[in-house]
């Protein structure tokens, strides 16, 4: 077939998820689109941000009040030593009650903020999933030819989840962290500008140190990830081909390769972990030197009555907490990059070109005859490479048209055009005298029944799967359809008969049995036009005979398109379309084609020579 599937590279392990640290191509544009999605929930969103700000503003007052308690205790102790009184426990009790109320209020606003932001992000995720689900029904089949299923699934699941989770955490965290920095700085300056200057000196030193360590460790982290990928790839390869490895005595080679990859992983891992592990103790060392300087300066200022003794404790608390929001902002920025990258992939999907809309006043036939006409049809999966050129054919109601050709010749192309899975480049296809574009897609596909080798059955009972062809069918109608398809006897051999539940991949029944069930489903739907895919040698002879009998019964009185694998079974077909490398090379019936002594004759003779 000419439509070579071009898989976009999946964005994560096995096509599911994004790579960590992936950045959006258009950060500003993507975030603008994202904010438009938040607009319906802007009240909750803004109230959530306001709650975050209020919570932080209340919280930053806490250390100052703690310092007042210490000052009160110290002052009371000094008064007692000097014989001027003692500690005022009533004042301390009131201050503690105030402190408790402040922290409780801050927690309440923080909880409310989390509840509101979680609601906004999940509502937005719900809205995106709903739009994506509606979008997927509008996409042409060509979209799925050009994009891997793993990549599409990743956009539906991982990207939306990443977007929801990171948006919930990053925006509110970033806002509250900015407010924390400003709040801590204001409170520190209110205590002493000299101590604030002393505390801020150590921050550039810590940042320089972190940058040096990160630069040194980065190459080892890259090597670690590369080695980890080699180890994982080797293990997956060896386990999936374990039988072949043992059959060819490849265990020693496999172990030798694994040891080589594992040694590389060990070397790069311990170096990267050692260097990254140095950051915390070194930054703590610089931070502690800064705290010592703050304490000495604070003691000096206390002696000179510039600050109270409790202010030293308050200032140290602010200093220790000051670097936390800085690191949170850094993490939030990285998270926002992930949010934008995930959102960009989601918006790319939502912006994909859709199928041409159905006509506003479609044709609805009460009695479908099954007359099909191809008129000067031109088509190519790639517009620059036409595979069907100026093809015309008239098929009477009830006639059988076989489509033959070697494997990969593109035999399903014609039936895909008939089902309007793809739009024609030129020409027209008519059913009962009406252009297929005059029908709705659902109306068109209701006229056509498909029985393909790759039989699609969903997780559920056999009865539910058969009724999929006609949801309103009674149990008796389902059973009659199963009998007509020669599958009723097989169903009764199962423990639960028609109520037997098929698993997700229908692996609890054979391929031939799956195809018999799809024949029964087609019988129940009772279409006037059929598309059939013959059984191949992958099923046993008895099942193949049953499938052929079922198909013969199904084709009676119906216009049928048969994708043929054995040319002996379609000698009596009214029309035969011969395809090779995606092109139609011959058209006629069996006798006409054999007289031409062309490609069909070679195919036919080759099959019988093999037999």
Which residues are covered by each model-predicted region?
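Juxtamembrane loop-to-helix connectors within ABC transporter transmembrane domains
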Residues: 30, 38, 70, 117, ...
